[in-house]
Amino acid sequence: MINLRQQMPHYLRLMRFDKPVGIFLLLWPTLWAVWIAAKGAPSFKIAVIFIAGSVVMRAAGCIVNDFADRHLDKHVQRTQMRPLASGSVSVTEAMLLFAVLSLIAFTLVLLLNRLTVELAVIGILLALVYPFLKRFTHLPQLWLGVAFSWSIPMAFAATVGHVPAVAWLLFFAAVLWPIVYDTQYAMIDREDDVKVGIKSTAILFGRYDRLMIGLLQGSVLLTFGLLGWYLRFNYWFYLGLLVALGLMCYQQFLIRHRKPPDCFAAFRNNNWVGFFIFLGILLTHRN
């Protein structure tokens, strides 16, 4: 028998509820899309469904990731004490928890229209495949960007019944952003990853990592600027982008020596990038 009271702290760690920054990194693109699709006035129902769905799917994604990496995590100092790698949670427990979370997510999406449900199926497949890609390609961060941003076409489908061109422009910007912060994150484990055969953009970029991150950051802001021009957003949106630019410059300062604690700080700082872009979107629809 599973002792839920005893195991609950381990389950929460498995779902990364002890590290909520990941929830927000998934949530910000969702909120960008929900607010833009609804022209600043989303329905309460859609907002709640997408917020709850982001939290649930992030937790489910963490379980899949740890299941895929459970044998590799034992050899990486930062991850060797994760619940599945350390044995504090069994594979059976993890799969049961994943099934419960998937059922919750499926129930939520059934409250939306058919197109959104169809897109959700694709989103689930994207999330399931991602953890296994790091064994075969140096671009798992690109797939992560697609998976993390798939809520954008879903939000437009749920709100307006189709996915317009502007949704794909927002999607493009959102896909590039996780490549930025997950490359910063991968810089932490680069030496260990090389030893165990894990691939990442941090390894692919090598000594050009800061340059490539900078180019990606610039591309994110440029695409958002184009989006703002196309939608005729006011100065509040561009002020939000200006703050985001300042934060990205600070991230470049943090990773200048490529020290793991500083790379992790840069990764976490992206939460504020997402927040200020959302704040700009929120305020541009209030004025």
From Swiss-Prot:
Membrane topology annotation: Multi-pass membrane protein
Record field: transmembrane: 21-41, 44-64, 91-111, 112-132, 139-159, 160-180, 211-231, 235-255, 263-283
Pathway info: Cofactor biosynthesis; ubiquinone biosynthesis
Signal peptide feature range: none
Cofactor(s) this protein requires: Mg(2+)
GO cellular component: plasma membrane
EC number, UniProt record: 2.5.1.39
InterPro entries: HB_polyprenyltransferase-like, Prenyltransferase, UbiA_prenyltransferase, UbiA_prenylTrfase_CS, UbiA_sf
GO molecular function terms attached to this record: 4-hydroxybenzoate polyprenyltransferase activity
Record's subcellular location: Cell inner membrane
Function noted in UniProt: Catalyzes the prenylation of para-hydroxybenzoate (PHB) with an all-trans polyprenyl group. Mediates the second step in the final reaction sequence of ubiquinone-8 (UQ-8) biosynthesis, which is the condensation of the polyisoprenoid side chain with PHB, generating the first membrane-bound Q intermediate 3-octaprenyl-4-hydroxybenzoate.
Entry protein name: 4-hydroxybenzoate octaprenyltransferase
Gene for this chain: ubiA
